[in-house]
Amino acid sequence: MVYLLLGTGFEETEAIAPLDLLRRAGVEVATVGINGKVVYGSHGIGIEADLELGQMDLTSLE
């Protein structure tokens, strides 16, 4: 499992492009909102994260 952490003011393209490429490659990826489930990027675009920070399963990390 790969966690992509998203915080307020993140660069949308820098988050979405790698997320797309990883998922196309078959990598299991979850987006994680640091400041809640909905996170707003630098251009005001809201992204609903898969998880909030407290929901991460740290036992699945390698």
State the predicted function of each range.
Residues M1-E62:
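Extended, subdomain-level signal for the structured scaffold at the beginning of enzyme domains
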